[in-house]
Swiss-Prot record:
It comes from Campylobacter jejuni subsp. jejuni serotype O:2 (strain ATCC 700819 / NCTC 11168). The keyword Ribosomal protein does not apply. Signal peptide: none annotated. One of its GO terms (cellular component) is cytosol. This is Ribosome maturation factor RimP.
């Protein structure tokens, strides 16, 4: 099953997916984006496309709930493409060495991400594989 093609059919672009457990329930979440933003009708349309397909070819074992959503303003960055699409945005990063910092994404080149540290304004380049966790954030 090609989630990217199915999302495109609904006029959306696939961002990410995850399987989580909340209150003892398995939830399979699909995050999508669209120029101008994703609305409730977009999510419902994709859910209607996916539900009959998932009834035949389940993406997860056992019972689950399907959720279609926008990744939001403060979203997880788990692929190099996510960083490339987030140039100019603020990000909180935890490295594999458990170092934590906040920075602005300046550039992405292959597997390397150039960041400007928000504390000292120093520019640094980090390899994507050295990042354990990253999430965009908004300063209010």
């Amino acid at each position: 099953m090609n989630l990217e093609a199915l999302c495109k059919e609904a006029g959306l672009s696939f961002y990410d997916d995850e399987l989580v457990s909340e209150n003892g329930r398995k939830i399979y979440r699909i995050y999508v984006q669209k120029e101008g933003g994703v609305n409730l009708d977009d999510c419902a349309r994709l859910s209607e496309i996916l539900s009959p397909i998932f009834d035949v070819e389940s993406p997860v074992n056992g019972e689950y709930f399907l959720e279609v959503s926008s990744p939001g303003l403060e979203r997880k960055l788990s692929k190099i493409e996510h960083f490339a699409k987030s140039i100019g945005e603020l990000v909180k990063i935890t490295t594999n060495e458990k170092e934590k910092f906040e920075a602005k994404i300046i550039a992405v080149d292959d597997e390397n991400i150039t960041l400007e540290n928000l504390e000292n304004k120093e520019k640094t380049t980090i390899n994507f594989n050295d990042i354990k966790k990253a999430r965009t954030f908004v300063e209010w």
